[in-house]
Every structure is written in C-alpha cells, then in structure tokens.
C-alpha cells in the first residue's frame, strides 16, 4: 500500500507542477520524502533516525566543540528541533541544572562551541542531545581527554649533504607549531610525527615521534620527488590531529651519469663462488683425513695382542727373543723340550679311574699291563751321547745344593736310615706271617749307557731281547719278588728337588732289612766326596752287592754319594781290589735295577727316576764305560 501511495503522490506532483508551477513543489517533495523514509528507512542520512554525537575536540586545551548528526530531518528541520545541553561537576557534586549550548554557529553546522569562559580543565563534562523534548544521545568526558591539536604550519626543508656517489642526499625538515596552541608558555606539550614518500608511491614512511619542530631525513635519491607531511598530538594522548599541508621536495641531480639503476653488488656470483670454495675445502679435508675418517666410520675389529712383543720378531722367526720377552711374566715359562734330548721315564697309566680300586700299586706294577713300561726302559738309547734335557746351569746348581745338603747330614744320615729300616721291618712282620723264600734268578746283565757330559742325567736301561725277556720273567715270577725292593716311603727331599724313597720289602739279596745289622743297612748310604775325575755310574754302586757280605769284610767302607753319578779316583781304586771277590759271590744272580729317587715329574702320567747301579763283571766294566781317563784306566787294569 505504501509503495502504491508513493507512486500516486509522485504522479500527482508531476501533474501539479505542470499546472501550478513551482510553488507546490517543496510541499509535494517533502511529503514524498517522508513516504520514502517510511517505506525504506535506510535511505535516510542517519540509519538510526536519531541525532548522534560524532566527536568532541579541543585544539589547544582552552576551548572545545562538539559535533553531531541531524537525524531524519536533515535540511528540512526547523530551528530548535535538535538541542544540546551540558552539565559539569563542580567540586564533588554534579550541578542539577542542565544548560543549553552557548554557541551553535562558531563551530559550524550541527555543532556547539565552548569558548574559554565555558571551558574548565580537569573537570568532567556531560552533554546530551534532545529532539522534540526527548534525549536522543548522551556523552561524558574531560577536556584534556579530547585534545586534538591543529596541524603544524610553515613546513620547509634544507639540504644537509650529498653522498660521494651523487646518488643520495640528506635533508632537514622544519615546521611551526599550531598557531592556536600555547606551546611557548608550556600550556600544552605536543609530539610531532613526520611522514614522507615518493610522489608516485602510495605507502607513507613514518618516522618516530619527536618533540622538536625539525627532523632530518636521510638517504633520499636525488632524481626523485618526495612528499612530506606532519601531524601532532598531546604528549600524554594517542589521538593525533590533522595532517599539515604536503611539502614537496625535489632534489637536483648532481651526478654526471644517470642513476636510474643503482650499482648492484654481485651477491649471486659471490654466493656461487663461496659454495664452490667450501666444497673444494671439504673435499681436500676428507682426502687428507681419509684414514682417520674411515676408522671413525668403520672402526677396525680388535685383534688379540700381547703387550711388549714386537710383531716383527714373530715374522722374522726370532723365537728366542720372544721367549725372553715372555719369560718376564710370571705366568709364562719357556718350553725347552723342542731342542732337548729324549727323556727316559716310566709311564704310569692312570687314565681309568676305576683301575685304582682294582688292586694296589704293587700288583699293577707286576702285572702284564706294565710290560709297556718295561719295554720303554729296555729300549736302546741312540741318543746317549747327547746332553741332558735339563740345562747345565740348573743341574749344576741343583747338584751343588745336593752336595751341600749331603755334606751337612753326613752324621745324621745313618741314624735316619736305621730308624726307617726299623719301621719297615715292623710293617713287614705285621703283614707277612711266613718268611719269603729266596730264589736266585738268572738274568743277563743289562748294559748301562752313560751320558757324555759330566752332569748327572736319568738312567736308561737298554739291552737285547733276551734281557727284556729275562726282566719280564723275573718280574712275573713270584719267586723273584724277594730280589725286588718297592720304595713306598719318602725318606728325604734334597735341596735340588729330588725325592729319596725308602724300601718297603726285602732287599735284592733275599735278606730282610731287619735281619741286617745297622752298619750293613747304612753301608752304601754314606756320603762320598765329589771329584773331577770321570767314571761309570755302575762301578760306583757295587756296594749294593757287597752289602750281604759285610760281616766278613766290614773294614772296607767306600764313601760316595748315592745321588751322584761320578765317583773319585781314590774311591775307585779302593773298591777295585775288592770287586773281584764280591762279584764272584753274586755273579750268579743279578737283581732288577731299583729306582730309589724321583728325578722329575715329567707329566701327570710319567715320573723320571734316578736308578741305582747294577754290579758288573770286570769284563763288562770297560765295555760299558766310555768316559774313563788314561790315569784311571792304568790304576784299574792289572
């Protein structure tokens, strides 16, 4: 309905203007405008259809003015339709009377101006707009809060300097404070902000606010034209006033060449060459440290290495130097068996633990299983002329110590042996109820091969097949047990490390140790004095066969050391005359040689024993002895 009414009104207005002229035009347009406002309220100047405050401003902190919109009746309202009333608080209370605006004209249309008579700082104000007796808008403030100074005036610039290249220049911009602001007396303190740009640009470059009325601008191009403007604000406020008029700065071109394009530093080339140089340095570093880098990336596998040994010694084959180095450590002992002679020893088979419970050591020694050991003892020594497996220095020390020990115990030795014989005799009486029968075995005399050197060595018994068979027959025959002594007790340990064993059964001649007098039992145990003359070991042990006949010939007592292999010439000549009668009595029977002391423990299965000498006839004496001097031979031979 309203739209049709509006269209009808326009049509009537058009027809009326054709007839009555322009007199009725304002009235018709006013009614049409009201109709349009009712149809579409957004077409009005104020969408709220009410007057409203836009701003209140004090340019110098002495006066202020407020502005508002006129609302719906813009340009058509009657005078006095919109009014402004204000009130201010004096002391601590608001005045109850609202006062109307003192000046609607000085500040412009739709504004109210308050001069210095109506302005008070640090006192709050409240203002309101009324239309047809009703309040449409209201606002409260203080004068110092609405200060917005006027723009500065009198802008100009001064050239400071020009660069050596003639491309850039520095200028100084100056201006004057706003004329209505009492800056000289300090009533108001202002801050200024300068902005500049090239004429063809749209973005302004702002400088920091300053309190002075001049500021330098640096690095302006000489061939460009710049636009400069300034605005101000109160020191304690953030609201800037209006900008001043723009100042155009045109700098003359002082350079002889055109500077449309500045000299560009070749950053691109520098970056390329820099990367290339760094790459070359990196490659050189890797090439020079490739071994170290390889060890860091791929560490070598550690190999066993003995500290203190030079690998070159192992490559060159100097094993003696290696053994010397290793001998420094306590847990290493050099092995000399590679370069030593064969060592003869009796092998004891103790692999099977069950065999230990089958019988005694004596039964196993006499059994057929021990034939292997006898064969070893009966093997011929082709290496008899070689030196012993033990170092001469070590053996020389051991035998010297043994000689000292034997010399000091010369008096106590017979007494100790006598006591041991008594103990063995007592054990034999307890074990044997009936005396054993003595039978004289017939054996061939085994040959004794001696060492070439003057140092003692373990004895090797070698002979023909008949000798081996005779020895086996004698050991296997029960009747020959009377001629064998088994040493089961340790009587003494010498300083050289040898163990002296004591017999536990009858002697080889069939006479029990308890039936023999103490002098006979200790006849061959006396110590002899070692001499430098060489002679066979077998002749030194003839006192063993003389022992049964000592009752008749006790006046002759040869003195030699049982553990020594070589005897002196004096002892040999003393016993040479008696050997004939003694050997005739015992030539018919020859006992198996007995091992009275342990020389060394070769292995967990083997023992190296020192063998007692066997009596030999006169004819065998020279054949078995290869180391007799001429003087000794002249004394022995008739």
UniProtKB/Swiss-Prot annotation:
The protein's matches in InterPro entries, at most eight in alphabetical order, are given as:
FN3_dom, FN3_sf, GHBP, Growth/epo_recpt_lig-bind, Ig-like_fold, Long_hematopoietin_rcpt_CS
Q: Which Gene3D superfamilies match?
A: Immunoglobulins (2.60.40.10)
Residues with PTM Phosphotyrosine? 487, 595
Query: Motif Box 1 motif: where?
Result: 297-305
**Residue positions with a glycan:** 46, 115, 156, 161, 200
Q: How is it modified after translation?
A: The soluble form (GHBP) is produced by phorbol ester-promoted proteolytic cleavage at the cell surface (shedding) by ADAM17/TACE. Shedding is inhibited by growth hormone (GH) binding to the receptor probably due to a conformational change in GHR rendering the receptor inaccessible to ADAM17. On GH binding, phosphorylated on tyrosine residues in the cytoplasmic domain by JAK2.
Instruction: Mention one GO biological process in which this protein takes part, according to its record.
Output: growth hormone receptor signaling pathway
**Protein's membrane topology:** Single-pass type I membrane protein
Renumbered to this chain, the signal peptide range is 1-18
* Protein family per UniProt: Belongs to the type I cytokine receptor family. Type 1 subfamily.
Q: What's the stated role of this polypeptide?
A: Receptor for pituitary gland growth hormone (GH1) involved in regulating postnatal body growth. On ligand binding, couples to the JAK2/STAT5 pathway.
Q: How does it assemble?
A: On growth hormone (GH) binding, forms homodimers and binds JAK2 via a box 1-containing domain.
What name goes with this protein?
Answer: Growth hormone receptor
What organism does the UniProt record list as the source? Canis lupus familiaris (Dog)
Q: Which gene encodes it?
A: GHR
